[in-house]
Swiss-Prot record:
Protein role: Catalyzes the transfer of a methyl group from dimethylamine to the corrinoid cofactor of MtbC.
UniProt record, GO biological process: methanogenesis; methylation
Protein name: Dimethylamine methyltransferase MtbB2
Pathway involvement of the protein, from the record: One-carbon metabolism; methanogenesis from dimethylamine
EC annotation from Swiss-Prot or TrEMBL: 2.1.1.249
Top-rank EC class of the record's enzyme: transferase
Record gene name: mtbB2
InterPro entries: Dimeth_MeTrfase_MtbB
Length: 467
């Protein structure tokens, strides 16, 4: 009797497959991506490598030593203090505590602050509160800290917003009116996002994370691209990450273009050049999980799409890897076996420059991804490598080589806690454990500025405030 391996369905249910069935599913998932995106197939060796990862006997797996990548985040601290019946675990805690827990306890390379109603539009009435939270976090933290939210253009339509719902207009065959409504909403999305981030950047934010770009279709992406363009023009040093909502941009409008390219129907490898053109530092491509398909099918499909996106992108790619995307099952508590296998495959086969950790409980998301493929933040040098990716648009190899040269170590040492512990204390660039007298917060970041030859926004704010 053939050996069967414990794997998952796209909804997280455990299944058992033989090696022959796994290979069949891998080929089918890969072919689906190749057909839809008109991209090359994975090589035979890559399919074999995927199968090897899936059939590894351990519950958790990880990347080979030296292949670790930085992680970024969606939903911020909501996975800790959120309690809305999804993936938040409802721990009563401040956002400062949540951010520092990711930095100090989870070993995150970067973190983000976000509002409980995680979209830019609802932030407007409480932006002063968000600015104060950002200032306090920046005074206490060392890793790059973004402000993150969803463009969420749907909030600009009735009954939540001022513009008539284009879906209702199209049902009434009022096509021109529907187009007008989407264009007006996109303009407001751009305006609001820029306004919010002007305030947050003035309060020390390292940058902005656009989470689930194009969730409301091509007009949503249109508004977001113009927001990125405006922010880059006004703030040349702002860190900007643009993560997508889905693998294909829905053509709700159908006629909108950016840089002469029609947005409707774009796949990840076609989205990447436009995100870079607008001025983002990091692109977060997405591949949706099909809950009725197996994990081999979903993972091969996702890896194929992401490999093409990485090759087409001139900026680093941090693949979105929350529940329901990136080959990960659609489950609030993502199975650790599936998460770590997907994380390893994305780094070793797709060649991604980082992982954008998405929705899921703390153990299933940040802890699993960081254990599988992360650089462990301040425990080693993950925060430094992440800063170079965002400061200079460096892909993973270049960023690691740059930081290693500055530290006078080998690139493999950048994820070595033993090497980096002593070095961080010696250079006074912040250590993860509490050491009396060691530089913390702004002081540590000022030393990082000198070490890496970069400017850090919260340090600039501090310098302006001193007399």
């Amino acid at each position: 009797m053939a050996t069967e391996y414990a794997l998952r369905m796209g909804d997280g249910k455990r299944i058992f497959l033989t090696k022959d069935k796994i290979m069949e599913e891998l080929e089918a998932g890969m072919a689906n991506a190749s057909d839809l995106g008109e991209i090359p197939d994975l090589s035979g060796d890559e399919i074999d490598k995927l199968a090897e990862i899936l059939m590894m006997p351990g519950k958790t797996v990880s990347v080979e030593q030296g292949m670790e990548v930085p992680v970024t985040h969606d939903i911020g601290t909501l996975r800790l203090d959120g309690d809305q019946g999804n993936s938040g675990v409802g721990i009563p805690s401040s956002r400062l505590v949540g951010c520092m827990m990711h930095e100090r306890a989870f070993g995150a390379d970067t973190m983000e602050l976000g509002h409980i109603d995680y979209s830019y539009k609802p932030v407007k009435p409480v932006v002063a509160n968000e600015c104060q939270a950002m200032e306090v976090c920046q005074q206490n933290m060392i890793i790059p800290l973004f402000y993150g939210a969803m463009p969420n253009m749907g909030l600009y339509y009735t009954p939540d917003g001022p513009f008539e719902n284009p879906g209702d207009l199209m049902k009434a065959f009022k096509i021109q009116e529907a187009w007008d409504s989407m264009e007006h909403a996109a303009a407001h999305l751009t305006r609001d996002t820029v306004w919010v981030m002007q305030k947050l950047f003035a309060s020390g934010a390292d940058g902005v994370n656009f989470d689930t770009t194009a969730a409301a279709g091509d007009a949503d992406m249109y508004g977001t691209l113009h927001a990125i363009e405006a922010l880059r023009k006004e703030f040349p040093d702002m860190y900007i990450e643009a993560g997508m909502a889905g693998e294909c941009v829905l053509g709700m409008h159908g006629n909108l273009q950016y840089d002469g390219v029609t947005l409707a129907g774009l796949w990840p490898h076609q989205q990447a050049p436009l995100i870079a053109k607008a001025g983002a530092n990091v692109f977060g491509p997405v591949c949706n999980t099909n809950t009725s398909k197996t994990s081999p099918w979903n993972l091969a499909r996702a890896v194929n799409f992401m490999k093409a996106a990485v090759q087409a992108s001139s900026i680093p790619c941090h693949v979105d890897m929350g529940m329901g995307v990136g080959g990960i099952p659609m489950l609030e508590t993502p199975p650790i076996d599936a998460v770590t296998r997907a994380s390893k495959a994305m780094v070793e086969i797709a060649g991604v420059d980082g992982i954008o950790i998405g929705v899921g409980d703390p153990l299933g998301m940040p802890i699993s991804h960081i254990m599988a493929s992360g650089m462990t933040g301040m425990r080693a040098a993950g925060d430094l490598v992440a800063r170079m990716q965002f400061s200079k648009n460096m892909k993973i190899k270049e960023a690691k080589e740059y930081v290693a040269k500055k530290l006078n170590v080998e690139t493999m040492d950048l994820a070595d806690e033993y090497v980096m512990r002593e070095l961080r204390e010696e250079l006074d660039i912040g250590v993860i454990t509490s050491v009396p007298g060691a530089a913390k917060g702004i002081a540590a970041k000022m030393n990082i500025e000198k070490l890496l030859d970069v400017k850090i926004n919260s340090c600039n704010l501090f310098r302006k405030q001193t007399r």
